[in-house]
Amino acid sequence: RFRDLLETRKGFAGWERAIQERYFYALLRVGPYTFSRYKVAWRYIARSFITAVIAPMQDPYLGETLPLPNEKVVYVGTDCREEAYYLCGILSSAPVRCCVICYMNPTSISAHVLDKLHIPAFDPADSRHLSIAALCEEGHQASDPRCQDAVRQQLDRAVAALYGLTSADLDAVRS
C-alpha cells in the first residue's frame, strides 16, 4: 500500500540506496544507539562545535519518552547519565573543542571527529570523571550566563587536568 511512497524517499547514501532498492520497507540508520536513554549530540551541519546531552523527557500523555534526533544531528548513545555528561563535558571543553575545530570540515562535523580524539573511557570509580560529568550537568541546568561561564571555566580546568595540561596550555587553547 505504501510501496510507491517508500521507494521515492530521498537522502540516502549510495550504500543505503542499494538496500532501499532491494528492500523498499527498510529502516536505515537505526540501531541500539537510537534507543539509548541518553545521547551526546551535536549538529552535523555547523560552523561551530557545540554539544549537548539529550535526556528522556516527561510527556503529559505518554509518560517518559526518548527523543529521537533527526539525520542532521550526530550523536553517541549511552544508557548511563553520568557517562553522557562526562562525554559531553570532555567534548565541550576548550582543549578538545580546539582539537575538533582544527580538524573539522568548515561546514560539517560528523562522528569521525571522535576517531581523532583520545577520550578516556568513562570510569564511574574515577572521581575526575564524575567531577567532569557533574560540572557538565550543572552547566546544562544553569540559566544565568555568568554562572554558565564560571562552570565552563571549571570544566575546562577539570578536563585540562585529566589530560595533564598546564594552566599555560589551557590559556593557549582558549585564545
Please describe what each predicted stretch is.
Residues 1-128:
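Polybasic, glycine- and aromatic-enriched phosphate-binding surface used to engage nucleic acids
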Residues 118-175:
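Non-catalytic DNA-recognition/assembly elements of restriction-modification systems
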